[in-house]
Amino acid sequence: MPNKDDDNLDMGDSNVSRKGGLLPDIIIKILQILAIGIFTVAIMIIVSYFVSKMVVSQSGAPSDFPVFSNEYLGKPPMLIWYESIDEIRGNTLDVPPKTFVVKLALGYAENNVNILNELGRQKVRLKDIIREYFSQRTGQEIKNESQIKAEIKARINSILRNGEIKEIALTQIDIFDM
């Protein structure tokens, strides 16, 4: 006796059309083409990224920020320089310690006459702030002059009452091995 399942067997009748099968085949083809396109674009992006990195590294271009020209920055303000702070000596935090010798000048606005008297009265405290700053650094840390200027300027301005220092000029920085 034949099973009931035998009635559902496909005998290969070619007259039966399968409309539902055509639409998924088209969608699958479109998805395949999209996947290949996305994969190709991703590979192109990755390759161009690495090629550009190689070109930049071989060109010898510095990776630091560019130095701006004077035309772009404008003229600096006219300052009066207080240069009465003596040479400051001390030891760094290096092991073994190194000796530093520092001399600097403090620039302030030319229209501020009160700050000159205050700088004269605070001279001992200013020397102590500067000596303490350099004594808390290693010889390697002392090499970043722009950071040194900004930090010392902030420390000095925190104690001044009659104005502020606009700029610091490091006229001498020497570090000696002991």
UniProtKB/Swiss-Prot annotation:
One of its GO terms (biological process) is chemotaxis. GO terms for cellular component: bacterial-type flagellum basal body; plasma membrane. Keywords: Cell membrane, Chemotaxis, Flagellar rotation, Membrane, Transmembrane, Transmembrane helix. InterPro entries: FliL (IPR005503). It is found in: Cell membrane. It is a single-pass membrane protein. The keyword Plastid does not apply. The chain crosses the membrane at residues 26-46. It holds the Pfam family FliL. Belongs to the FliL family. Controls the rotational direction of flagella during chemotaxis. This is Flagellar protein FliL. It comes from Borreliella burgdorferi (strain ATCC 35210 / DSM 4680 / CIP 102532 / B31) (Borrelia burgdorferi).
